[in-house]
Amino acid sequence: MAKQPKRMQKWTGDVAATHALDEAVKLVKANANAKFDETVEIAVNLGVDPRHADQQVRGVVALPSGTGRDVRVAVIAKDAKAEEAKAAGAEVVGAEDLVERIQGGFMDFDRVIATPDMMALVGRLGKVLGPRGLMPNPRVGTVTPNVGQAVKDAKGGSIEFRVEKAGIVHAGIGKASFTEEQLTANVKAMVDALNKAKPSGAKGTYVKKVSLSSTMGPGFKIDVASLGV
């Protein structure tokens, strides 16, 4: 028999089975056996073709239980808005100087927020931030005059999501140390946000498959009906 990968050795059940949401959460927690606090990840297969402009799915969701991770925020702003960002807890704040640092390879942040007046500057960073999914965008609230609130949202559990080429959305929605109730609430919030972001061009079944896993654990398929969608 072929040797199972390490992340599958603990689970001997039927990998093709589907589970109600609460049962899937229990299984993910029970199989998160690494020596670190594993991230719990959701994968949602959507009935969209991202190659078409009218089938793009992108947005932001405030997870009610937070993410369990320390989010480092960079803000591109100046004067009073720069001070507002610092007061809200942004780790890195700057204008032309910060743009030049990022162009030079500085990437010690998880989220980039910018004020609208800085977008001409930020445009220089498209090739650097775009492929990493970090480019500020007004559609997800990372281009805004309200930088203080945006920083607080990012640090308080607000995450961005975007459909990938295969029509799948991946996101970290908590830690294995979270309670079952916390993880369940975050999953429901994520699926609700995806439903609200349903594009006009989506036809047929929108939420097709949902699975939940931890960083080193197996994936468990969730019965979509148990999500109320």
Swiss-Prot record:
Q: Which UniProt keywords apply?
A: Repressor, Ribonucleoprotein, Ribosomal protein, RNA-binding, rRNA-binding, Translation regulation, tRNA-binding
Q: Does this UniProt record's set of keywords contain RNA-binding? A: yes
Please cite one Gene Ontology biological process associated with this protein: regulation of translation
Q: Which CDD domains match?
A: Ribosomal_L1 (cd00403)
Supply one GO molecular-function term. rRNA binding
The superkingdom of the source organism is Bacteria
Q: Which GO terms describe its cellular component?
A: cytosolic large ribosomal subunit
UniProt-listed InterPro entries: Ribosom_uL1_bac-type, Ribosomal_uL1, Ribosomal_uL1-like, Ribosomal_uL1/biogenesis, Ribosomal_uL1_3-a/b-sand, Ribosomal_uL1_CS
Q: Where is the signal peptide?
A: none
Q: Which Gene3D superfamilies match?
A: 3.30.190.20, 3.40.50.790
Subunit: Part of the 50S ribosomal subunit.
- NCBIfam families associated with the record: rplA_bact
Q: What does this protein do?
A: Binds directly to 23S rRNA. The L1 stalk is quite mobile in the ribosome, and is involved in E site tRNA release.
Q: Could you tell me what this protein is called?
A: Large ribosomal subunit protein uL1
